């Protein structure tokens, strides 16, 4: 099975360098989000929406052998990788668009981590998740809550805590529990240029400068974030549920 090239769009654990601090931290915080979700799953059927290459779905299935886990992703290569590398008796994968995926059976819990900022129509994803959710079900989702558009070309939206919560409110889903994470920047290789990357974040500084040339006002947003939070990216994972449940 061919491992796709290094990008900032999806994480493939076999690509990550255990000797690189940024790679180690990236995998750690992603797995910690899944661990947060895994210990809060409810009901029998769980959907991992936009599951990527499947390492997170595998984590959910491993820690919840009594539940059926379904991983959905739009990328056929990611689903093929998941099927080849992350299989368990209670885990299946489907190649489908997160914004339009349908299922005859509802899901008791839907997990979608670091997905919303990648999509052109975030509200359409939340609307679809709400439609797929069983009565009394919950959604566990995450987004970055510091600027990321300058450093990651696959991110289409920035969110604050308030704007993140606002996506779910029209569907009667309110935040019940939150989990915050910090990832400090690693500067090694930030402006490196090579034909092929040695790690995911290599050369990101070049993309950042190019972004500011096209979007100079965004630099003010970045500076404001740096003054408040330092050289870090911050992430928020939240469990949403109807308050009447």
Q: For each of these PLM feature ranges, what is it?
A:
Residues 114-118:
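A short His-aromatic
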Residues 144-149, 181-184:
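Short "lid" loop at the C-terminus of a central beta-strand within the Rossmann-like core
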